[in-house]
Amino acid sequence: MRFMAGPAGSQSLGPLCFHSSPQALYTVLLIVLVMMSLVFGKFVPVNWEPPQPLPFPKYLRCYRCLLETKELGCLLGSDICLTPAGSSCITLHKKNSSGSDVMVSDCRSKEQMSDCSNTRTSPVSGFWIFSQYCFLDFCNDPQNRGLYTP
């Protein structure tokens, strides 16, 4: 290894071969930023494809109870039923003028939805039937029923 003697050997290249201190500061700042992004940053690839729509559920899940009152809850057949997409959940209210309200909750297919939100008289004298449909999972269960009441 040879050493240079004379004026060329004593001449310093300066801090990292920079000719001015602002250039050195910018370079140090750039190095710090790159190091911080490598240490703390995460590489997230860019997806240029349009987002795919969420898959439509195959079945609607509904609450099923064959005999229910507000005071006592479900008395007969508490269960879950599945119905194809496009169908609905239903709650039938059988009421009379004294305030009695007996309910039946179930699934209803598209073909059976002709009486949607319909009030009609019952075969039992003094009672009428009100049907209430909804189209979200478990929208007819007792906790959610009030949220979907028109």
Swiss-Prot record:
GO cellular component, one term: protein-containing complex
Mod. after translation: N-glycosylated.
Leader sequence segment: 1-41
Domain UPAR/Ly6: 60-150
Disulfide bond positions: C62-C89, C65-C74, C81-C107, C134-C139
Key words of the record: Disulfide bond, Glycoprotein, Secreted, Signal
InterPro entries: LY6_UPA_recep-like (IPR016054), LY6G5C (IPR026110)
Glycosylation, residue list: N96
GO molecular-function term, one example from the UniProt record: identical protein binding
Subcellular compartments: Secreted
Tissue specificity statement from the Swiss-Prot or TrEMBL entry: Detected in T-cell lines and fetal and adult lung.
Pfam families listed in its UniProt record: UPAR_LY6 (PF00021)
Annotated function: May have a role in hematopoietic cell differentiation.
Assembly, per entry: Forms oligomers.
Protein name: Lymphocyte antigen 6 complex locus protein G5c
Organism, scientific name: Homo sapiens (Human)
Gene designation per UniProt: LY6G5C
